[in-house]
Amino acid sequence: MKFNGSFLYLLQKLTFNLVDLISPLEYKEFVLDSLKLANQSLEQDSKICPDLLYSRLENVDEKDILTFMELDKETNPLVWSCIANYFALICYHSYQQSGEKYLPQTIESVDEGTIEAYVSSYKQLIADNNQLVQQLSALDFEPILNDPLVDNYFGDLLQEIKLKQ
């Protein structure tokens, strides 16, 4: 599974808009820092190790996205689902870019179903959240709408956002 710049750009934009929906401040700050790190990893000359990204998703210290997802009873689980799936996809991409042959089990299982789960969760979130729709309406998706990969996975979602404006 390969990603292109437009696809990753869209994932970034959609996911960053979910941070405000996380209730506990500690979790919100951790996710924001993690997303910034993920963005840095996508830069052309990035020296960020895929293992560092993966440790933000899952680690033995239990200060990671998957643990917070389990512990947080206030935040909509769909928000956490999107964030965890985004991070798994970014980790997968980072490992692929590095040429790593052996992946952590969680990352090894990343496939098109991960993308589909992300899109499905996001659709459910925008169905019930006008504030999120307004935030997304302010973003310019025009430059990436003609990308076949973006259209394949996100065409319906982007149409829903447009219709709700």
Region spans (language model):
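Charge-dense, extended regions
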Residues: 121-125, 129-165
